Amino acid sequence: MSSSGLDEIDLNSLRDPAGIFELIEVVGNGTYGQVYKGRHVKTAQLAAIKIMNINEDEEDEIKLEINMLKKHSHHRNVATYYGAFIKKLPSSTGKHDQLWLVMEFCGSGSITDLVKNTKGGSLKEEWIAYICREILRGLYHLHQSKVIHRDIKGQNVLLTDSAEVKLVDFGVSAQLDKTVGRRNTFIGTPYWMAPEVIACDESPEATYDSRSDLWSLGITALEMAEGHPPLCDMHPMRALFLIPRNPPPKLKRNKKWTKKFETFIETVLVKDYHQRPYTGALLRHPFIKEQPHEQTIRHSIKEHIDRNRRVKKDDADYEYSGSEDDEPSPNNRGPSMGIRDDSESSSMIPMDNTLRKGFQKLQESSRGFAEPGAQQLRRLPQQPAPAPFQYQQSRYVEPRRESSEVKLRAVSSRGAADGPRHSPASRPRPVSHHQRSPQQSHPAAPHLADLANYEKRRRSEREERRERERQAHHAMPIARVSASVPAPQQSRKMSEPLLITHVKPEDLDVLASELSKMGGHHNGRSREESMSPPPPAPPPREASISSITDTIDVGELDNGADAEWDDLKDIMMNGEGTLRGPNKPLPPTPTDGENTLVSDVRRNGNGNSGHGAYKGKKIPEIRPGIISLDDDDSDSDNEEGNEPLMFKPINASSSRGALPDLLPKSPQLRRQINDQTRQMSDDRADESASLFGSFYQPNGFQNSDSRSSIQHSFSNRDREKSFVGYFGGGAGAGGGTVNRPGRPQDINQVQVNVTPNSNGTPAENDAPEIRKYKKKFSGEILCAALWGVNLLIGTDSGLMLLDRSGQGKVYPLISRRRFDQMTVLEGQNILATISGRKRRIRVYYLSWLRQKILRTEGAGSANTTEKRNGWVNVGDLQGAIHFKIVRYERIKFLVVGLESSIEIYAWAPKPYHKFMSFKSFGSLSHVPLIVDLTVEDNARLKVLYGSTGGFHAIDLDSAAVYDIYTPAQSGQTTTPHCIVVLPNSNGMQLLLCYDNEGVYVNTYGRMTKNVVLQWGEMPSSVAYISTGQIMGWGNKAIEIRSVDTGHLDGVFMHKKAQKLKFLCERNDKVFFSSAKGGGSCQIYFMTLNKPGLTNW
């Protein structure tokens, strides 16, 4: 279509659909938007309504689709176009308005649905002939108008209630240039795509014409005959590579097909499109022309559909709710359990050029528009003058996306003065996902209403509160929190903490967001202002402020980068007594560093402030009178300074502001609080003094700040649970030393504390710390993976989750199934595992696991997912030994080692949302015990694997298998531990660890360093850590070495021999477990305190 023709379509002149059409439910996804079942308000006639967000980048494409529908939808085999509307959204500047395309509704679904609902996944031959004929008639109409559909497939061929066939989705249609008559753009869905269309992406000179639709018709006929298109088990990018290179597909002989059907398939599936007939010629083919009476076929199809019509919600498998975003990089990932639903697109329009180019480059080295998350539509009761529909965002929406929360106007003098946001005279707008009704649809409405009435309760209880304050004046002091308010407001007193009990977890993110908006105008206040403690007040009744944070749903976290895991900020009381909150949903409370509590104590309100630090572990339960809010520094340990109501590592020299008086003022009462905190801390984690005796580093030295006084301040209990460390200057050459740079070296020993430090010393230990979770597991712990801040644990009898964000509770998730290995991909909403008796590669949806946790807590619906499968197997693999997920740019490869082969899968984004086969290598001479994948010079893929005979490589281009290192011991088997692809080596340099040694080689087997890494003893586990170090767990010690040089950075000496197993790591946090002894296992984690880690 010419640009002048597009200019004739003025989107802004279209009418608003309010009062004309109403939405009923989501029925599918088009190229540029979701498709809804709708109803004409006056006539009740059903219609299909495609809703698209308008933006400048795709405005021309949308106009093109409208033009195509207007001109070419007047045919019996093309869905009729009724009209277009513009939905004006609240507060919209026009950039985010919605376009509604209203079309004929086809109530019997797509051809793909028909195939799925047919026994055996194969339609009758006469049905296939009828459907192919109707498709050809529709295509003939389009081709006569010089239009190529370019996305013919089962999902884009719909059936009406009377079994009429209609073509839909003109989003990728193209009008041919009247002179050339050919296109050279790359678009369509991979498995149905014609070879000449794929060639256009590889060669600018390649072209195609309308006959590319006939290849797609042939693939659709195979889909109807066999249940799926050819190569559908392959990754779509792999299919794009193979379609032009493989011979044309044919009908399989497992079913008796007529000769004319076979010749029809052979006629349309000709690779050279110049030899392919045109549409008019195919309409005269015997398979198309010689058919039974049309009414007979339509009647039989209709009867079949009516007989097999099922309620999708009851019988559907668990729908994938993942993300098209990349997994955050290991050094920049936000520990998040948030899950986002992405709608499934039905085609791969210019799908991920970067991704496609990356695959193409990898496979040949030797020779869009982001749709919103899937939304569930919920009808609201009739309201005066609104549109009769509402969007409801999916349950698994990331907190940072919840920008359309209800605006709460508190019933107070301040709120009354502000006035309503919109005047009553303003024109009412239909309710949408940008504007919700708190009275009817908001899940946190009761809690928000409680906040709104809080001022009234405060006034009525003022006298009672004053009396209680006088009575409590002589009782034990309570740790109080004061808001940072201007001087005129400092005389106001904070009333009792807001009591919120039995809050549903799914409501808490919304509630936290509302609290933040109530207090948003205070966030810009300088943190350097001192905060004077208010007079004592009685303890809260049943709950405290902590009930907001302690019960927060650990699943509603963001999948983004570290910025989404900022500190817990500014929970305070304003002068009117209103509880105020952060500017984003509250994160889980524990710190991965496990947790340094810091307070800057202001003494009795005078100008002199004393600095005191309390170093300890997460307090598992907030007792009345103690307000404890922890900062999660799991991914960012470099933040220093004092912020209101945050406990975090702090530099002693930092004096950016003062903290409230969080600790009692008298020494005696402060000791009581410290003892109470210590006792509660022991309920979650114990220091491992019984297991680890000393920590050494070569050529030890002492920090410049004197630590000798620390030793004398320890209690006997503290001293017993400390260990000794030596800091070595020689380790600096290894590049992986734990020593902080710039400190003088000394041979004196220093005391390293792993216990709560109550005497005000800053928590800046250079040596690693080890903590032990008190929970004992009866089964053998085989693997673990971090999911957000929490830990998924696989044992020989099930899967469970250790809630590190709360009180250390363990949630059982799956029982009676062995889990040997696991990896979490939060961006894809999956947990990949080797599990079960047959050792399958099984992928679990994190959102499904999250629902199990919510049901355990009584917060989730009991019927939410019980009838859905929350997992899927990868291929038909059995007997998996080891797998590795490797990221290359935006591609995620899954490499699986089996008993005699190695399989490679790649993650396919929407609409597939699964790992799909990429390549396979069978009949290996060595059993792969560990596997890995490297990309040499950003171009060549190589599989690396270790066996009892050494280490080997497979070149993906040539499929050549060769040895890269074979240990010298003849006749002896080796135990491979790990393969490390060294950083900054273009995927060429390796560290291969086996037995008690490690060697440096390149991917071609040549030694690169005349160095052999030598462990002090045979390790049971070896792992590469993100700090640039490699760790070995032996029976007598844990060694930490530089991965670049193999130099020893430090070693933990055990007090008694014990076998340990590495589980997982993130940044400088390392988790490992003890072997099953005495009937139970325990989990330890180590914080390496790597210098400069925050810059990694």
UniProtKB/Swiss-Prot annotation:
Pfam assignment, any one: Pkinase
Origin organism lineage: Eukaryota, Metazoa, Ecdysozoa, Nematoda, Chromadorea
Region annotation (Disordered) ranges: 293-351, 380-492, 517-545, 574-664
Disruption-associated phenotype: Mutants exhibit premature branching of commissures. RNAi-mediated knockdown results in gonad distal tip cell (DTC) migration defects whereby DTCs do not migrate to the midbody of the hermaphrodite and as a consequence this leads to abnormal gonadal arm formation during gonad morphogenesis. Double knockdown with mig-38 results in enhanced gonad DTC migration defects.
Biased segments, Acidic residues type: 316-328, 629-642
Keyword ATP-binding found: yes
Biased composition regions of type Low complexity, renumbered to the chain: 380-393
CNH domain boundaries: 778-1070
Recorded name of the encoding gene: mig-15
Name of the molecule in the record: Serine/threonine-protein kinase mig-15
Active site residues per record: 151
Domain Protein kinase positions: 21-288
Residues the record lists as binding ATP: 27-35, 50
EC number(s) stated in the UniProt entry for this protein: 2.7.11.1
UniProt keyword tRNA-binding present: no
